[in-house]
Design a protein with these regions (language model features):
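Short, solvent-exposed beta-strand edge segments and adjacent coil->beta transition regions
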Residues: 1-3, 180
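Conserved beta-strand segments of alpha/beta enzyme cores
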Residues: 2, 35, 273-275
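Conserved C-terminal "switch" segment of AAA+ ATPases
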Residues: 4-65, 70-85, 165-174, 212-215
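Broad structural signal for hydrophobic residues in well-ordered alpha-helices, predominantly aliphatic
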Residues: 26, 92, 205-206
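Conserved catalytic-core segments of large NTP-driven translation/proteostasis enzymes
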Residues: 42-134, 138-144
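Peripheral, non-AAA+ core regions of ATP-driven protein-machinery
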Residues: 84, 102-105, 111, 115-116, ...
């Protein structure tokens, strides 16, 4: 038995399929052929971003069907009255209630100790924000955010790499003897695991200890070794879709993942500057603001 991994649709592909197939079918199913509602691109994008979180189309189809049923009910409740044909964003919220998902965007400002990572979930790629803070203590590493064992080991490896190269990052040799470091990845109720957060965790720590903020339009993914090498990770297609969707402009990836770029749609690649790297040292000046 061979398992095939199918990459998710781009946002543009979802919109095209919705307008060409899903919306006409659901209008017909709801008996609205004589008074068809008009879906705008803005409304379909709202359904995709705020009412579904998926790599495929099942959820989007259900939400479009729900809007059509609500519209049919509205017409039946108001016989003789003209119901506006256009479905507005306000009507979507009236029909479906408040948004179910928060559409993640690149940070609005640059912050010290906060890096943007790219993760792969069952619903496709998404952004994760790694936060690092420091306080007086005794060499403890605190990790929160429902992290799995592999991700915890990635954080420990990142810290060990930075400690062993403290001089390179202009960190006093005895600094770690008197401080604790706390790493947190928000959405604490959502379990997180995997090695691909190693690079963004390392960058968050370098930013914190050097007091240089991470550029807000930069996202990273990659496994980090104790010697600072970057190893390839999976899910590159979906991760890059998530980066582009969120307004990220530069994505730093392991050099070993360059081979995966040939499968990325051209309209996605034209909006992203991809920076392949093999060592952590190669990405510091690209990712950190001066």
């Amino acid at each position: 038995l061979e398992l095939l991994h199918l990459s998710g649709y781009t946002e543009e592909e979802k919109e095209q399929i919705a307008f060409r197939f899903l919306i006409p079918r659901e209008i017909e199913e709801a008996g609205l052929g004589d008074q068809p509602p008009q879906f705008t691109h803005e409304v379909v994008r709202k359904l995709i971003r705020e009412y579904t979180r998926e790599a495929g189309l099942r959820g989007l189809e259900r939400q479009i069907a729900a809007v059509c049923r609500k519209r049919a009910h509205e017409i039946l409740k108001n016989p003789g009255q003209q119901v506006p044909a256009e479905v507005t964003p306000e009507k979507v919220e009236e029909y479906l209630g408040p948004r179910k998902y928060h559409f993640e965007l690149a940070g609005s400002r640059e912050r010290v100790g906060v890096a943007t990572g790219l993760a792969l979930t069952a619903a496709g790629g998404q952004l994760i924000f790694i936060e690092a803070s420091i306080m007086s203590g005794h060499e403890n590493l605190i990790m929160t955010g429902s992290l799995g064992e592999v991700m915890k080991e990635s954080a420990q490896a990142a810290l060990s790499y930075i400690r062993s190269n403290a001089e390179q990052f202009h960190i006093p040799a005895d600094f770690f003897d008197h401080h604790d470091i706390h790493i947190h990845i928000p959405a604490g109720a959502v379990p997180k695991d995997g090695p691909s957060a190693g690079l963004p965790i390392a960058l968050a720590l370098i930013s914190l200890l050097s007091r240089r903020p991470v550029r807000r339009e930069v996202a990273l993914t990659g496994e980090l070794t104790l010697s600072g090498r970057l190893l390839p990770v999976g899910g590159m297609h979906d991760k890059l879709l998530a980066a582009r969707r969120a307004g990220i402009r530069t994505v730093i990836i392991p050099g070993g993942n360059e081979v995966d770029l040939r499968d990325i749609p051209a309209d996605v690649m034209k909006d992203l500057a991809i920076v392949p790297a093999y060592e952590v040292e190669q990405i510091v000046e690209v990712a950190l603001a001066r």
